[in-house]
Amino acid sequence: MCQFLAVALKDMKFLPVEKILKNGTVVTIRQAIKKDAEGLLQTVSRYMIDSDHLVTSIEEFNPTILDEKRWIEALNENRNSLLLIATHKKKIIGNINLNGETRKKTRHNAVLGIGILKEWRSIGLGEILMQCAIDWAKENLTLETLWLHVFATHFKAIGLYKKMGFEEVAVQQDFIKNDDNSYSDNLVMKLSVKTN
């Protein structure tokens, strides 16, 4: 079970929690703070290089440490947004974010993004990060629906998302143009976090 705060205390929405991965390694899941900006940038840059399933390329990813601090601060201040990081021995190994919509008519929605270093994949970290974010969203007073976008050919990720309760709602054909000039479909998935 992940621990979170229904009401933020000094921008903290989520209490740190230790989790055990399938290989027995203990990791800490906690809310990101501005001091994490440099480490988070390094981690994101590393997993962007190792993944063929991200829309943003490493050449396009060029925020400064100040930009990253502002992004972290914005997510922490927005009551329907969350940014969690996974750490091992104080090194960031993955992250998940819920980017909550800010407009009145759409703020019940958040878009989920997740990334994990290559050497930490396939040992349960993605499921743990997703469960913590989903549990937090279920208790959030504003959020009703989580959305995500995924390459339609990223079957491993799609399997995890379905396991976590997401359902396919749309396919954008040929939405992604790959480096080799081939096309990939974008799959839109949704999870309702409020039961009426």
Label each PLM-derived region with a short phrase:
Residues 42-59:
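Helix-loop element at the rim of GNAT/NAT acetyltransferase active sites that forms part
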Residues 32, 116, 150:
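Hydrophobic adenine-recognition pocket in adenosine-nucleotide-binding enzymes
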Residues 48, 60-119, 130, 192-194:
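Acetyl-CoA-dependent GNAT
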Residues 145-150, 162-182:
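Conserved catalytic-core motifs of GNAT/GCN5-like acyltransferases
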Residues 130, 137-149:
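Conserved GNAT acetyl-CoA-binding A-motif
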Residues 116, 122-136, 159-163:
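Conserved acetyl-CoA-binding loop-helix of GNAT-fold acetyltransferases
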Residues 2-23, 181-196:
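Terminal substrate-recognition subdomain of acyl/acetyltransferases
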Residues 28-40:
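A short beta-loop-alpha structural element at the N-terminal edge
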